[in-house]
Amino acid sequence: MKFIVDQQVEDIEMPENLKLNTFLKEFHSVCPHSECSFGLYGFAFGQSPFPVPLLMQEALMKNANQGAYAPVPGIPELRNAISKYNKHYFGMDIAPERIYVGPGTKELIFNLLEILHGTVILPTPAWLGYLPQIRLLKKNYHMLPTNTNKKISPIDLKKLSLRLQDRQKILILNNPNNPTGLLHNRLELEEIADVCREQNITVISDEIYAQTTYDFSKFVSMGKIYPEGTFITNGLSKSHAAGGYRLGYVIFPQHAVDLKRQFKKILATEYTAVSTPIQYAAVAGFEISKEIDIYFDATRSIHQIMGEYTYNALSAIEGIKATKPDATFYLLADFNAFATELQKVKINTSQKLSEALIVHPYHIAIVGGDSLVLERTDFSARIAYVDYNGTKVLQNYFDNKPKTSSERIEFVKNNAPKVVAGIEMICTFFKNLRKESLNDLQTQKKKV
């Protein structure tokens, strides 16, 4: 029997990070070089490398017998814990009734896009997961290219909004940002919020990286600035290194009573409820404790140390520009200065650059600009600096915290050798590219 797939599903591409997994398996199976067996320099995979906090692991084991369905919005203990968590860390008074729990923020953002009417405004570069969801739902959307410092321009946001006919528009705000690692500060958020109020723009504020903000005092939730029009999403995957637990939450605006009813209907229809044992484990993760505070401080500091090293090392390579991260475990590297040399060797899209970097002898895995909703010919890439043993590195950090600049550099070299070697290999790739381009030029001159 021949099965026919719905065309809108056919048109959706596999997210770049998952597609890369498949490609790597195929590549290593046919690579004839012995060096291929070592693996790759993993700058493509955005997963926190640290262990799940022990108190969450223990809570999960303790509640493994919880086999009953949970309430659709989440168990009361968890919604209460999330309410207190937001008060303690983000200074927001959130009634538990405004909190809905789901199987990860990715699914919750999809659910919000399902129920909210209006054209979606997507700032670019963007996390690679937003656009496939928007397309799957057949929603109208417009890109909003960020300004030269890779942040949202309120002026450009207003200009775009004035061109749209919808009574309600939806802005996806990812703060801190994946892929740039940048943070919108309070003043910048206030300027964006002013436009949103004036233009009736609803905000989905994806704050999954909030706890990774290096100077945590600088993080401000959009929910504090624009509470009447902001849906906040957050979860366990980045702050608690528990992406596999698949648990996130959304905070509704205070007066969105009818919308909550509609949302509950969607959740009940699509997945009933999040795994009950996982919810009890999440209670332990969101409860205020000294253990969790220590965990946040340490992992945040390690991300910062790795980010500083990666930024400085890439910026030291002639022709490469990079965003200096304020948070997350990513930065955006700009290789467009090499565009002429790349095109000479028939690398004319960011996808082809990604493919050229992964093959022998380079073995460099990145997420290219086209996957980040940039132009296909934009030679930018997301660089994730988490290719190390997080359990071991966390223990080494506790044993001997680096204090000086030189100690921080040594910490990276000793604990993240693949990050260090991978950046050196990026340098080698572009040196070889320029050498090849120079040789071609000399050959052409001889012919003349």
Model-predicted regions and their roles:
Residues 33-36, 40-42, 233, 321-326:
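Short beta-strand
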Residues 66-195, 204, 210-231, 323, ...:
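Conserved core of the PLP fold type I
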Residues 343-347, 356-365, 371-448:
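PLP-dependent enzyme catalytic core of the Aspartate aminotransferase-like
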Residues 236-237, 320, 369-373:
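Short, solvent-exposed loop/turn elements at beta->coil junctions and helix N-caps
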Residues 228-304, 311-313, 405, 409, ...:
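Conserved core segment of the aminotransferase class I/II
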Residues 6-103, 288, 390-392, 410, ...:
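N-terminal small-domain helix-loop-helix segment of the aminotransferase-like
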Residues 283, 297-308, 321-341, 379:
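Conserved glycine-rich beta-strand-loop-beta hairpin in the small C-terminal domain of fold type I
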